[in-house]
Structures are given as structure tokens and as C-alpha cells.
């Protein structure tokens, strides 16, 4: 096992910085998605990018050579890990080369002539619905529906044109899709944030890297997990998540 680990580590090439001057970046959702905001903060607002419908589509884009990097949410300070993307990291031979943490500030968006009292149905991503559970619980009569992305929810409300519909998304989506902010900062935690990862198909790491994510399987027997985790202790490594 040690020989296999040593061989695997040698396959990764150390680099000084990521070269994304001519790179194509993919994010999930539509214009106004939080993934787009994370992408722009990491790569710059003028980066060459495109969007896809699902996180799996983003990983496929790297696999097929359509994109050099993908930006995916991996953990929220309120709702916890995004388990679907952990599964995708196992499924695809794509590797984490960076991260971007952004503040998540959810707003309730409706049509221009709508009032909060008109709302009967709310659309958003399931993670956002969880992050705004306290506000939504105070409106128990509202129906809640999850969609693939916050920006998708905002676009749907605009296109449907129903005064009783609202979306939970960033306030930026009100400007993009011609909606009105009915209420700002409706998330449970006012310091709500999400950690996004930047993944690529290349086995590289920068010399500033100080964190590693690994996935492994162990036998279903007594002490197996203990013996695996003991290597972290003996090598002076600190675990931040398991």
C-alpha cells in the first residue's frame, strides 16, 4: 500500500501558479448563480466561461475536454456538505486545485408588482431552502419547490409571471431577471457562507497548497478505520473534516 501511495503522489506535478489565461471555466446554473460569483472571484470577471444544467454536466465537460476548470459548491456553513459533489469527485478523475469561499446572502424575489403577502409558492435550490428554513417556517402556508439552481428559480418566476410566486436567490438576480426584492437576508445564519472548489482533469498542485482531500475504502472489520486514521496522527496532520 505504501508503494502504491508513493507512486500515486509522484504522478502529481508541482507548479508555481495555475495558468488559466486561455482556460475555459464551467459552472452549474444560469447567470446570477452563486457558482458564477465564486468563479468570478477566483478567475476574474472577464474569464472565458459557460454554464451547464447540472454538477455532473460540469464534470463531464472537463472529462470531454470542453472545459479546463469547473467550479462546484462543496460545503455550506449552515447546511453542511454538498454530498452529490463528493460522489462526483469519486466518480470522475478530476482533481481539486483551488477553493473560493463566498458569503451567501439570500433574498426573497418576486414580480415588480408583488408584495410578500401575495406569495403562495417559493422556488429555490434545496440547499437554499434549508438555509432559509426559519424564515420559511414562519410562512407555513407557502409551498416550497426545489429546482436545480437559484438563478433558475428567479428566471422561472419572471417567465411564469404569477404574482403568487417567489424565488430565493441573491439580490443580483433581481437586476438580471427584472424582479423585485421582497425581503433581504432571509437566511438563518447572517454569516452564511459556501466553500466552492476548483477542479481540473490535470494532476497538478501549486506550491502554496496546504490542504488535501482524499477518498479511500477500508475492509469492514474491527479497527480498520482506526488504523487508517492513525497515519494522520503519526505524520502530524490535522483533519478538518471527515
Predicted features, each with a name:
Residues 1-242:
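Domain-level signature for soluble enzymes in the chorismate/prephenate branch of the shikimate pathway
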